Amino acid sequence: MYKKIPYQTGRQLLDRFSSSDEAQALIDEELNIDDSIEALLENELYFDLVQFLAHGLPVREAIWWGAHTLDARNDVWSAMQKQCISTAKAWVKSPSEEQRRKSELFSNKLKLNCGPSWLAQAVFWNGSGSIVAPDLPNVLPDPFLYSKAVAGAINHSAALPNWDKTDEYYKKSIGIALELAKGSKA
């Protein structure tokens, strides 16, 4: 059902990040992706499910998901935070080293203290280029580092700045991810 998540079992994804004890207990070696997602949803383990989906989706889909999820908080973002989101969208549409390095500058300026800065970091860590200064020998990021940053962007924005719509935000966010996982362009 989720053609953009190229894994057989939920455990393959769950082992890629630090999940809650509840998620660990729910997803055994045999549980397929669809049933793993359903179990996390039914138990309202949204924090875990966001990490699960961020690690399951391909890089561009994951970053696109993060950008569209963060749009839900657009009323609280500063001009620079909004630029992080628009730069991430631009990178997804037309990946370039220029956009990747621009995202690095945004994440550095914002010091990873908000959801949009984590989204910018995800673009920088996407795996297409070095994560050190351009004049140094190339150092590529760990394979799923961008996933951790996308999950960080979404989960951070669910809580901060404070508000009373966290569950609604998570449900909308997860809906976007599941549509992307099915192959939609959301």
Task: Kindly give the residue locations of the regions a language model identified.
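Short, glycine-biased loop/turn motifs at secondary-structure junctions and
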Residues: M1-L112, S128-G129, P134-D135, L140-A186
